[in-house]
Amino acid sequence: APDYILCDESVHDDLVLALQKNISQFFVEGVDAAKKDYCSIANEHHFNRLKDALANALSDGATLVCGGETSKEGLHLTPAVLTDVNYNNSIMKEEIFGPILPIIKVQSLDESINYVNENEKPLALYLFSNKPAVHSEVLKKTSSGGMVINDCVLHHMNPNLPFGGINNSGVGSYHGKFGFDAFSHHKAVLKSSSISPFKVMLPPY
């Protein structure tokens, strides 16, 4: 799941409304009624980690605009959407690995690019724009493990594309031949002929 959204202020409110509408439709009868269609958090440790991260962000000034409901039984947490998140809060500095989505309001494309570049390189960058010039600029000025334009996660489903991170988000790639190469050792073997270059490289000259 994406760790955060950098959203232009001109469409911020529309995005929040759209997320509220879609999440409320899925959980119209609450999280317990939706459990058969919605997976739980992997274990209690990560469930508590996510609850603590959410509580910490809220205590640091963030606003919960929808979601964040926990099930009475099991380890279910509805997708929590946050606004007004402090840039320096830990939820913006670590990979969340859970259904919590902070939305950061930005005033320009440059501000978004600068934020991405000032933090750890992401496993994936998802860009939503209908402007080819914006596509090119973000592609040239940012570094990420992968990039998808106007969608999410689809590159992970294509066996012909390498999937992997860069720096802290991962090393190497897998899928198809990329995975075979990543888990293979390319052994260098050189057999020198009788005409060795060292004959002219070593003294006496």
Residue positions per predicted region:
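Short internal beta-strands
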Residues: 5-6
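NAD(P)-dependent aldehyde/semialdehyde dehydrogenase
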Residues: 9-121
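Conserved C-terminal structural/oligomerization subdomain of aldehyde/semialdehyde dehydrogenase
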Residues: 69, 76-205
